[in-house]
């Protein structure tokens, strides 16, 4: 539970700059684009895979496409890039107002990854500990936002 209202949290998780600010993996470097406002909105995240130490991919860009959107309640997205299509996984957040703040659930679903991609990597790429850390960073970021 984050002691803030859902609108303040949603403002961070729907904004490309917010994605970079709360990333615990170290891969997200910067962003280009406007905050999401609807399904099919897109923005670009400039990445560096070297922080994971698993593949020598260097710097690259991904396009984030919003796949689910309910203002101040729910957002999901998939990623694709110049050298790779969306592979069937998605990320997101579910926000539920509760006494004293908002219950935030991180969504990270790899269950529909296309079989042809499974041999190409270790799934999921982002560890559970990094996802949990992102929630802590999200709380700190929301508290620091005026």
Question: Residue spans of the language-model regions?
Answer:
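Glycine-rich portal/gate segments that line the openings of hydrophobic small-molecule binding cavities
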Residues: 31-83, 136-146
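A short, polar/proline- and glycine-enriched secondary-structure boundary/capping micro-motif
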Residues: 55-57, 86-90, 114-121
